[in-house]
């Protein structure tokens, strides 16, 4: 097994559980045995939490959580944790303000990501802007969130910011789509000098001939910088006679030009099979949104939404997952910037 390095701050208190001796899954990812870590009715007025993002913060952990309110409208709530497993969810929605400090609340907000770039945290979510569109807010303290310009025109979802600038620019993945439930979708990458004006749009990768991701794909957790490239966990969707099935996939993008796919795993890494993934408000969903990872040990904790009803936690080791992706890689001519390599 090759030695792979991770370039990020160490997180010695990363949540962790060793792989069970009786785990026979092909991919080196295993579920936390006490899943789901967040169940139904986790806070007053919130029926379900799922598809949420978490980060280390001042020795503890903070997250932005998609909460389905009891009126059915999704919004984003803050949560705090000592161990990144047991979460205290605020009963109050995040209060967004504009750059003048005036309240500026989206009509609804869902599927957030949370990424630190330099000394600023960026929350990214899907909202209504004449249809499904990307919203962004910045924060220094994870208490006050200042909204900034929407990066793209509608319709777009699944925006994921890279954790550092590349060649002096912010870099973000997104998935252009329609305003409905989107029976299509490829991952694109865009650049910005200031988080306001976005351009240099490039195609990264699309759906594949593998059945588990034959309908559409979308970005998941923020990419992890490694010596092999950017490690990306994403979701792939298949269509069945019983509806969509969302699984977790893995790819490695070029470190300097992330529109280039170096490796893309032909197999899913995690697919619905536990009760909390197969049964829920939207059945058969594993939807990755965040990782907590420790550069010293190579431990990676993956947070994913389960059946649009719960939050699940899974684990892997950097060396093992990179080796698995590389040894099961199929990169097609439809992947990368302009459809050829």
Segments from the language model and where they lie:
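C-terminal substrate/ligand-recognition segments
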Residues: 289, 293
């Amino acid at each position: 097994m090759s030695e792979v390095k991770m370039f990020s701050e160490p997180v010695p208190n990363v949540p962790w559980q060793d792989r069970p001796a009786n785990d026979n899954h092909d991919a080196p990812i295993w579920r936390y045995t006490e899943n789901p870590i967040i169940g139904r009715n986790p806070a007053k007025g919130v029926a379900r939490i799922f598809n949420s993002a978490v980060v280390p913060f001042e020795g503890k952990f903070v997250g932005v959580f998609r909460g389905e309110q009891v009126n059915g409208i999704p919004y984003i709530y803050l949560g705090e944790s000592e161990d990144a497993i047991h979460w205290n969810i605020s009963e109050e929605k995040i209060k967004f303000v504009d750059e003048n400090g005036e309240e500026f609340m989206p009509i609804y907000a869902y599927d957030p990501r949370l990424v630190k770039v330099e000394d600023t945290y960026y929350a990214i979510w899907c909202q209504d802007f004449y249809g499904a569109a990307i919203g962004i807010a910045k924060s220094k303290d994870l208490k006050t969130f200042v909204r900034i310009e929407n990066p793209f025109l509608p319709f777009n979802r699944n925006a994921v910011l890279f954790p550092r600038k590349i060649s002096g620019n912010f870099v973000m993945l997104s998935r252009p789509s329609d305003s409905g439930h989107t029976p299509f979708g490829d991952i694109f990458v865009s650049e910005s000098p200031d988080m306001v004006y976005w351009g240099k749009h490039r195609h990264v990768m699309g759906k594949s001939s593998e059945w588990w991701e034959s309908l559409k794909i979308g970005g998941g957790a923020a990419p992890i910088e490694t010596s092999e490239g950017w490690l990306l966990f994403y979701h792939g969707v298949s269509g069945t006679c019983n509806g969509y099935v969302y699984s977790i996939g893995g790819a490695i993008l070029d470190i300097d030009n992330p529109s280039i796919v170096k490796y893309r795993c032909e197999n899913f890494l995690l697919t619905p099979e536990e009760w909390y993934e197969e049964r829920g408000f939207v059945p058969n969903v594993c939807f990755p949104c965040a990782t907590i990872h420790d550069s010293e040990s190579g431990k990676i904790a993956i947070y994913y939404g389960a059946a649009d009803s719960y939050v699940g936690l899974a684990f892997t080791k950097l060396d093992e997952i990179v080796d698995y992706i590389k040894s099961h890689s199929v990169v097609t001519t439809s992947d990368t910037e302009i459809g050829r390599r």
